[in-house]
Amino acid sequence: MQIKHLITLFFLVLIGADQCSAFFSLIPSLIGGLVFAIKGRKKREVSPQIDQYRNFQKREAELEELLDRLPMY
């Protein structure tokens, strides 16, 4: 074989090995994602959502009060 064929073959093997290592490093995250999908997501706690809703209502009331104080042009 000529040198240019050996260099081409070397680069092809190098690229193939790089792609395989990238694929193999992806496998653990893929398995983790499948386990996460099968087990289902953790149920969210309701209390933070209730606090968020109360804060939203409070800000909405403050905004309405502020708008009521503005003069009408």
UniProtKB/Swiss-Prot annotation:
Protein family according to the UniProt entry: Belongs to the non-disulfide-bridged peptide (NDBP) superfamily. Short antimicrobial peptide (group 4) family.
Keyword set for this entry? Antibiotic, Antimicrobial, Cleavage on pair of basic residues, Secreted, Signal
Q: What is the lineage of its organism?
A: Eukaryota, Metazoa, Ecdysozoa, Arthropoda, Chelicerata
Q: Where in the cell is it found?
A: Secreted
Q: Which organism is it from?
A: Tityus costatus (Brazilian scorpion)
Propeptide found at 45-73
The UniProt function text for this chain reads: Antibacterial peptide.
Q: What is this protein called?
A: Putative antimicrobial peptide clone 5
Q: What is its main location?
A: secreted
Q: Which residues form the signal peptide?
A: 1-22
Q: Name one GO cellular component term.
A: extracellular region
Top-rank taxon, per record:
Eukaryota
Q: Which GO terms describe its biological process?
A: defense response to bacterium
Query: So which tissues is this one expressed in?
Result: Expressed by the venom gland.
